[in-house]
Structures are given as structure tokens and as C-alpha cells.
Amino acid sequence: MSTVRRILVTGATGNVGRRVTAELVAAGAYEVRALTRCPETAGLPPVVEVRRGDLSDAAGLAAASEGVDAVFLMWPFHSAESADAVVAAIGRHTERVVFLSSGSVRDGVEPDAQSTPVGRWHRAVERRIEESVPAWTHLRPSAFAANTRWWAGQVRVGDVVRGAYGALPTLLLHEADIAAVAVRALTEGGHTGAAYALTGPEVLTQAQQVRIIGEVLGRPLRWEELSRDAARRRLLADDGFPDTFVEPLLDGYAQMMTAPRPTVTGTVEAVTGAPARTYRQWVAEHAADFV
């Protein structure tokens, strides 16, 4: 496998992609190319080569992939329909892909037999990558800590956060930890063929997460349980999420409520040498998002 010098980051202005880009730039040893829909507002470091485009444009993606040694690939779609075109466009130009997959994917299970919609489409993309790229690494993160920003609107106007499945246990993961693992997989040897299950360091219910936000902000926040239908209406109307996102989300939550309690992995520390950050750390760093 050739030495990695030039790296393409897709989703470079997102929670994880921006961190990946920043770490690669800080290392000072790589040429970083970023793919974004709007270069004018990307706000990336001047040394980054910014290309206009997205994963829905296979031709543009192929052009952005020319001359790169590795690609950080995220998947913004709610299906795997375009996976063949996307992976083919990348695979013609690079030998190494680090894919931001999902913790919903289950090992040894075919895409169509995965237990959640998210697991099905992410495993389908994984399969395309495995068939097309010689050096691949899948990152399967647990829930993103950043996703709890969707409570910010409720937190700003009161001390009650309303939603469904407040007892749902999750392993919230800091985006900086995902990025740190991604950078090592992009730039180091020894990660080919790995599917890393990445988790935060503690199991927290949604109600506990709300309480932690309140403790960091110095406010008595509490969770109020809604029915699934009421939560769906809130997510669609008040929070503005599309139905294609809300239904798989709630389906996944319902299945997770009856699944075995999630297990903390030590993968972040094993790969990076540093323990995974806590949710309280994430909230402290992003407290301004809730005020």
C-alpha cells in the first residue's frame, strides 16, 4: 500500500468531517482536500483544497477523488441506492477508504437481514466498499453526543424536555473521538479490514442526559415522557425533521428498548491511546448551544 499523502474528506463541514479535517491539517504532513456543497461558507483552513460537490454527484466525486491516497467517507442518505455509483467513483482513484458507518450494523448479518433500517443501508454501503476497495476500515459509532442538540430549542424556553423513550440506554460518543480514530485509520497501517465499534465511556438514558445538561447549565432540567405518536409529531412539526428520518429513528429506539443493554467498548482508547470523552465533557464544550 502506498504512503498516504493526500486525503479527501467528504462531509467536511459536518460534526465529524470538520474534526477530521482539522486533525489532518494540524498534523502538517498531509494535503487535505475537502468536498462540500458550498465552499464559500465552509470556513475551512486556507491550506485545505476545497472542492464543490456532494455524494449525489458521482462525476464530481470522481473528479474530487483523482490523485488522493485515502478517502474519509460519510453517508448522508437514508438508503443505499446510490452506493454503487459513489463507491465506484471513489474506488477508481484510491486504495484506502475509511467509512463512517453506524453502530446499528451487526457483524455477520446480511444487509437485508439487519434489524434496523439504519443498519440495513449502512451495511449495504459497507459491502460495496469491501468489494471495491483493497484497504477499507469501517467505523461503527454509537449515538453521537451532538445529536442531543435537537433538545436545544426546548431547553432555551423551559426546564422540561419532552420526548419518547426516556429510559432508552445509549452510549453517547463525542465527535472528536470518532475523528481521532478516523485520522489514525486514514494515515496509519494496521487498520485494514477492521470494523471498529466505537462507544462513549458510559451508558446513559435520555432522561439522564437531560439531567446532565441541566447540571452543566445550572438549571433543574427534567424529562417528560411522550407517546410515540406525540413524539413523532413534535419531531416533524416543531423540530423540522423529515419523515424519512423520524420513522427509522423511532423504529430504532423501539427496538433498542427491548435489546440487551449496550456495552461499552474500549476501542477509542485502544486505537488512539486516550480514553473516550464523557457526555458531560461534550455538554461543557457545547453549553452555548443550549442557551
Where are each of the predicted segments found?
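Oxidoreductase cofactor-interface core, primarily capturing Rossmann-like NAD(P)-dependent enzymes
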Residues: 2-45, 56-59, 66-68, 77-84, ...
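Cofactor-binding loops of NAD(P)H-dependent oxidoreductases
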Residues: 53
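Hydrophobic alpha-helical packing elements
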Residues: 60-64, 279-282
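Acidic/histidine-enriched alpha-helical segments
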Residues: 226
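A hydrophobic C-terminal alpha-helical subdomain
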Residues: 229-291
